[in-house]
Every structure is written in structure tokens, then in C-alpha cells.
Regions:
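Hinge/lid segment of periplasmic solute-binding proteins
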Residues: 43-58, 129-198, 337-344, 424
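Extracytoplasmic "Venus flytrap"/periplasmic binding protein-like
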Residues: 86-172, 206, 210-217, 302-306, ...
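Short, solvent-exposed loop/beta-turn-alpha elements that line the ligand-binding surface or hinge
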Residues: 54, 58, 144-172, 257-276, ...
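Extracytoplasmic/periplasmic substrate-recognition and gating elements
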Residues: 89, 95-97, 117, 187, ...
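Glycine-centered hinge/linker elements that transmit conformational signals in sensory
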Residues: 226-228, 265-295
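Short, low-complexity disordered leader/linker segments with a strong preference
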Residues: 1-65, 89
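Short, well-ordered beta-strand elements
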Residues: 46-52, 62-73, 94-99, 123, ...
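Long, aromatic- and glycine/proline-rich binding clefts that accommodate carbohydrate-like moieties
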Residues: 50, 338-343, 394-427
């Protein structure tokens, strides 16, 4: 069981066919900036970073304050604070002010408002639709030149690093996660991945084993399993799916059906293929096979862990929310064991799952100085390329690290090896 869970989580993290996280890909509304070398007002040559010019010498060691908006709870903030201390040993004059701003939607709405008065943070958790919204005001710094910069920066301990990413650092990112940063229609890089999750199928392994049920790998198989579950337990709602939006996006990708486009006609989802699978799922709902968060009125994990008369035996939700899919102990014993599998597919030989979890973007404009942008980049680079931070943050949050090396790191592998269907479901 342990090996199976580990294999599933690593498989979904490594799939090449990853989707953009919640919401369609909206094109950048700003013009594609020129790149190359341009003189600054003093006649010096600077490296151009899309719409941002890297100052000659990169970070000059000046005192700067960086505001970082995120959604971290107390446990993750503790991890972040530890690594801010480590970062400040290298860059003592870069002061990080990290703020939890509700959920992802709250972050987006607050920043969208603050952009209008030029008071946006320097770094923010983001999803692709956030970046597209901010870019209406051309507020997101493109990272290409920063990534490619070979400017040497001297740190407080006397060591040096290049401002940009080394070839080894670039190659260490999981490719699908890294490429999410350049999906906005102009080929430029706007984000780096912070931590990621995907959707998985949680199932009541105890119930499945007792009734000889096979975990479905396709939607056809899922329909058949739902029918069998209704025969066994007529009061059951066999499947709960937390995110209707994710389901629709995932199905368009699995079918290879049009959804949105960064160029030409932007909205392509109203087509026969998509109508057909929506119609099919509606029939399942009418048969009592499924519910969703919108229909149920809450996360469907509540139905999955229920010990009441009406319950579900399968739940599709975030891999980072595994603890919410675990039932409460009764007299020191869990009512059932939870199994984890990849979500059903249209074609099991060509699996596709959605990529979720925050990336980091650097905001510019308003009162932001060039040194704040460069300092922000150094901190973003630190969080996203530091294997120790990535593994500790991931084991605390349940999200997957974005680095190949972190997934293979000894302590993280040992943590994953604890995985089971009970107390260590998070791993």
C-alpha cells in the first residue's frame, strides 16, 4: 500500500501532459516588450529583461524591503520564517515582510485593487489567471533576462552566485511546472513554480476490498463501479468531485477538445465534444452516481469521510488535501482505510491530470524600484531552487516539491515511505 501511494504521487507529478491550474489561459493584454541592451539615463549599458532592465551589477547591496503576499497558514509560515533567516545570512539588507492574505482569490483581488493605486506587493503567490489579470496593467515582471543573467553577485558570507539560473538549476525544475510560467501567448516567462499538487482519486479501500471492486482507471470503468456501489448501498452517492471547473478543464484536455486560446478566438469550449461529456455526467447525477462541491454545498470530502447513512466511497480532490479525506478515529481506530489512485482517464495509456498549487510572480510599477525587483528575484530564486526548503515545505504542506532533486532527496524519500491509508495519508 505504501509503495502504491508513493508511486501514484510521483507519477502524477511527473506526467508530461500537465494542464494549467484553475481557470483558462488568458492572453497577456500588454504588448510584447523589446529585448536586448539599452542605455540607461546615465549612458550605461543595462541588460533588458522584457519590460524590466537589470541594473548593471545586479543587486548593489542596498537596504530594500520586499513585501510577499501568500496564503500560508501558521505551520507553513514557521517553515518560511526559518528560511528567511537563512536567506538573510546571505543578503542581510533584503528585508522580507511576508503576509498571509486569505485564500488565492483574496490574494488576486487585493493585488488587483492595489495595482490601481501603485501599492502592490513585490512578490505574490499566483495562478495563471492572476498573472493575466495583473498584466492588463503590465504589472508583472518578465523573468527571462533575470533567468539568463550572468552578472556575479557577492553575498554577505563572501561567496558569489550568478544573478540568473545555472543550467543545472533550470534542468532541476520539473519541466511541466517550469513551463507553466510561459503560457501567456508571448513566449515570455512570468512565474517560477513554488509548490504543486494535482487531483487524485481517493477511495474507501476497505469497502472496495470487502466487495471485490476494482479501482477504475477510465471514466467508463468509473461508471460501472458507481452502478455496482448503488446496488450494494442504494443510499450512497458513489462519487464526490470537489472542483467542477477542474473537472471540465481536465476533460477537455483528456479528450483533446478546444477550451481556450491565447490567440485568435479565445473562447473555444462551446463545442460538441465538451457538450457530450457534460451531458454524460449530468446523466450520472440524475442516477445518483455523483455530486460536486457546488451541488453538495461543501467540499465532498465531508461526504467521503461520513459515517452517516448517506456517504460516498470515492472522492476526487487535491493531493494536498489528503488529511481532509481521512475519517476521524472511533475508539482509537480509523473506520476505514483510504486508498489513493490517479483520476480516471479517457485513455488510460495517455493519462492527463491538472496541475495546481502556487507559483511566484514579481510585481513592478508604482513605487517599486529596480533594486526591489532584483532583490525580489533573489528571494524567489532562493525559495524555488533551494532543495532543503523545497523538501521541508512540501513535507509540511502536502504539496509536491517542484525540483527533481528534492523528490529524490533522502529525508523526503523517507517521509514518503511512511505513507499509508491511515495516519500518514498526507505523505
Amino acid at each position: 500500500m505504501k509503495r502504491r501511494i508513493v508511486a501514484v504521487l510521483l507519477l502524477v507529478a511527473m506526467m508530461l501532459s500537465m494542464l494549467a491550474a484553475c481557470g483558462g489561459q488568458t492572453p497577456n493584454q500588454g504588448e510584447t516588450p523589446n529585448q536586448g541592451e539599452t542605455p540607461n539615463q546615465g549612458g550605461e549599458t543595462v541588460q533588458t529583461v522584457g519590460n524590466f532592465a537589470v541594473p548593471e551589477g545586479g543587486y548593489d547591496g542596498s537596504e530594500v524591503t520586499i513585501r510577499f503576499y501568500n496564503t500560508m497558514g501558521a505551520n507553513l509560515r514557521e517553515v518560511l520564517d526559518l528560511y528567511i533567516v537563512e536567506f538573510n545570512k546571505l543578503y542581510p539588507n533584503i528585508h522580507i515582510e511576508a503576509s498571509q492574505v486569505g485564500n488565492y482569490d483574496d490574494v488576486r483581488e487585493q493585488i488587483a485593487t492595489e495595482i490601481t493605486v501603485g501599492n502592490q506587493p513585490n512578490i505574490a503567490y499566483c495562478y495563471p489567471d492572476h498573472v493575466a489579470l495583473y498584466n492588463i496593467a503590465k504589472a508583472v515582471t518578465t523573468l527571462d533576462g533575470l533567468i539568463e543573467s550572468d552578472i556575479e553577485v557577492t553575498r554577505a558570507d563572501g561567496t558569489t552566485e550568478i544573478l540568473g539560473l545555472t543550467d543545472e538549476q533550470k534542468a532541476d525544475f520539473i519541466e511541466g511546472y517550469y513551463n507553466e510560467g510561459k503560457q501567456f501567448g508571448d513566449g515570455l516567462m512570468y512565474t517560477l513554480p513554488m509548490s504543486k499538487s494535482t487531483e487524485v482519486l481517493y477511495y474507501n479501500k476497505t469497502f472496495f476490498d470487502e466487495n471485490g471492486l476494482t479501482v477504475p482507471t477510465t471514466w467508463d470503468e468509473l461508471e460501472a463501479v458507481c452502478a455496482k456501489i448503488k446496488e450494494i448501498d442504494p443510499n450512497a452517492i458513489p462519487l464526490g468531485y470537489d472542483s467542477e471547473a477542474n473537472w471540465f478543464i481536465t476533460m477537455t484536455e483528456q479528450y483533446g477538445a478546444p477550451y481556450t486560446s491565447a490567440t485568435g478566438d479565445h473562447f473555444l469550449f462551446n463545442n460538441d465534444t465538451n457538450k457530450e461529456f457534460v451531458k454524460r455526467f449530468r446523466e450520472w447525477y440524475k442516477k445518483g452516481y455523483l455530486t460536486t462541491q457546488e451541488i453538495y454545498g461543501s467540499y465532498t470530502s465531508g461526504l467521503f469521510v461520513s459515517t452517516e447513512e448517506v456517504k460516498s466511497y470515492m472522492s476526487i480532490g487535491s493531493s494536498a488535501g489528503a488529511t481532509h479525506q481521512r475519517p476521524k478515529m472511533v475508539d482509537g481506530v480509523y473506520p476505514f482505510e483510504v486508498g489513493i489512485a490517479t483520476i480516471p482517464q479517457v485513455d488510460a495509456s495517455n493519462p492527463k491530470v491538472i496541475s495546481q498549487g502556487p507559483s511566484l510572480c514579481i510585481l513592478q510599477g508604482g513605487k517599486t524600484s529596480d533594486q526591489q525587483v532584483v532583490a525580489s528575484w533573489l528571494f524567489v530564486k532562493y525559495l524555488t531552487t533551494n532543495m532543503a526548503f523545497q523538501t521541508e515545505f512540501s513535507s509540511t504542506s502536502g504539496y509536491m516539491p517542484v525540483l527533481e532533486s528534492a523528490q529524490q532527496e533522502e529525508n523526503y524519500a523517507a517521509w514518503l515511505a511512511k505513507a499509508d491509508g491511515y495516519s500518514f495519508l498526507t505523505a
